[in-house]
Design a protein with these regions (language model features):
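Conserved beta-strand positions in the central sheet of alpha/beta enzyme cores
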Residues: 41-44, 146-147, 180
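An N-terminally biased module of ancient metal coordination in phosphate/nucleic-acid-related enzymes
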Residues: 1-99, 103-104, 132-135, 208
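Flexible loop residues that form catalytic
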Residues: 46, 150, 184
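Generic beta-sheet signal
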Residues: 100, 148, 201-202
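Charged catalytic cores and adjacent phosphate/nucleic-acid-binding surfaces used
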Residues: 1-19, 25-30, 34, 54, ...
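Aromatic-lined carbohydrate-recognition surfaces of secreted/lumenal glycan-active proteins
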Residues: 144-156
Length: 248
């Protein structure tokens, strides 16, 4: 009955071997699907800047065997892989798999960095643009944008702060559809205090990341309905998924 839909267990921030994840798309689908708990996941592999220093270091370490991001000439194949696995996930597990990407800006000047997820992405989006341009391009595709770990600041040399969207929220909040209020094991209480539309995600890269913050969405189990519920951000809750169980 409309209005009385159950909560769906969702994770909208998942990486695979298409970027810096440990598992293939098929292995991710089987990991989430085999729990019998998940209703919706989004595969959101990185689209990187050309001069991303972390990715360049990774390519050197792997002798060029991995790109650590989805390149423009591979993007159609990436979507085809996600589409094929989405069909299998729905048939085998009753689980929706949404195509996405994390448009990733890692600069040495950390105050300029942003990581932005596009959910239900249809076309490649370059990370070489400004955050404003990326957000507008996501909206132009009728996709959903998520500000990833928006209040993550670090003083570690090998980590990247990603606070540009948060530091410029007054100018950009109308373009950001959702803000991560929780990412893996971290809670960003400042996001909820501002009453911005929120989600919670695992930022999955390896199997142990399955046990982390997730989103509960009260919605019918189809992407148009889930997308509307996320935008409305009324029947939404955070949950901590632990040892195969969750609680709102």
């Amino acid at each position: 009955m409309p209005g009385y839909e159950p909560f769906l267990l969702c994770d909208f921030h998942v990486h695979t071997q298409w970027s810096d994840g440990k598992l293939s798309v098929a292995e991710v689908v089987d990991l989430y699907g085999s729990t019998g708990k998940f209703d919706v996941i989004a595969i959101t592999d990185h689209i990187l800047m050309t001069k991303d220093l972390l990715a360049r270091a990774g390519r050197i370490a792997t002798l060029g065997r991995r790109a650590f991001g989805v390149r423009e000439h591979d993007f159609e194949h990436y979507l085809e892989n996600l589409c094929a696995e989405a069909a299998r996930a729905l048939e085998q597990y009753g689980m929706l798999v949404i195509p996405g990407a994390e448009i990733t800006q890692n600069r040495l000047a950390g105050r300029k960095n942003s990581h932005i997820i596009a959910l239900d992405i249809q076309r490649y989006i370059s990370a070489e643009q400004s955050a404003d341009e990326i957000l507008r391009e996501i909206r132009g595709q009728n996709a959903l944008s998520i500000a990833c770990h928006p209040h993550h600041r670090t003083t570690r040399r090998i980590e990247i702060s990603t606070c540009y969207l948060w530091d410029h929220r007054e100018q950009l909040s109308d373009l950001v559809d959702l803000w991560e209020a929780a990412n893996r094991d971290d809670l960003f209480s400042v996001t909820s205090l501002k009453h911005y539309p929120y989600v919670a995600n695992s930022d999955f890269h390896k199997p142990k990341h399955l046990y982390s913050w997730k989103t509960l969405v009260r919605s019918e189990k189809n992407w148009p309905a889930v997308s509307r519920a996320l935008r409305d951000n009324v029947d939404i809750a955070l949950t901590l998924f632990r040892n195969g169980s969750w609680a709102a």
